[in-house]
């Protein structure tokens, strides 16, 4: 028996009928760029997360680039990020000519260390990117206080934390802009690349909306520098179906995580990353610390367990 890290087929069976029906409608309508499905997705996301604005984009990486551009990040600016994160957190900054500055993370939970962050702030610092790694969250209130005091933009890289709670609110509510990824393996995943930006600030939303589509105010009328970062309409159809079962999916993942914690917590050679008391994780990943990662991965592979 092979145990996969993600079982996409099982998830597909839960949405099969509704998805195939809506895809057929889309193909008959021949509307593949933005349109009704994308508008519906953005409405569904705002309702689910209780945010004012949602913007579908082409990937989680593009979501970060759009967010940074909307915040005016430019060449030689500095943006502080945790030193344990996915490469896109850093590369999105570098693609704009700015510099990612690495702050330490807490060894027990993998989130950005507040004191290390404070020590990295200088005159060139323009923004902080917080990362909800593996569904766990940093101390967003402390980060918000620091960013407000120092007049910095606070961006949430929530690629792995869609649906995670910070003190009874979804984590996408606490920052200037929050981003997520709908990569297939995510808690809310598409069947290709897709992502989204969220904000409660109208000016940032309107700027991001222009950036998403070549800086256009309207068709063929570009007013600022922009990207081709529109979400694929077919992927919007997929996510519209999957969001109907997202709460069930998060509950299922959390139940599986609890089984891992219960059955493996007595093994002294294995340590789990701690879930912070103010966080309710979306169950994105089960992450453990071991002395010899490569040896342990090899053993799990021999047992038919993907990592």
Regions found by a protein language model. Give the residues of each.
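N-terminal "arm"/small-domain region of PLP-dependent enzymes with the aminotransferase-like
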Residues: 1-31, 36
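PLP-dependent aminotransferase class I/II
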Residues: 9, 21, 36-44, 48-54, ...
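Phosphate-binding glycine-rich loop
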Residues: 30-78, 92-96, 102-104, 169
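Structural detector of well-ordered beta-strand residues that form the stable sheet scaffold
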Residues: 55, 80, 101, 154-155, ...
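Conserved SAM-binding loop
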Residues: 56, 81, 102, 197, ...
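PLP-dependent aminotransferase-like
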Residues: 69-158, 165
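Hydrophobic/aromatic ligand-binding patch that stacks against planar heteroaromatic rings
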Residues: 92-93, 146, 170, 187, ...
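Conserved active-site segment immediately N-terminal to the catalytic lysine
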Residues: 156-191, 206, 218-223
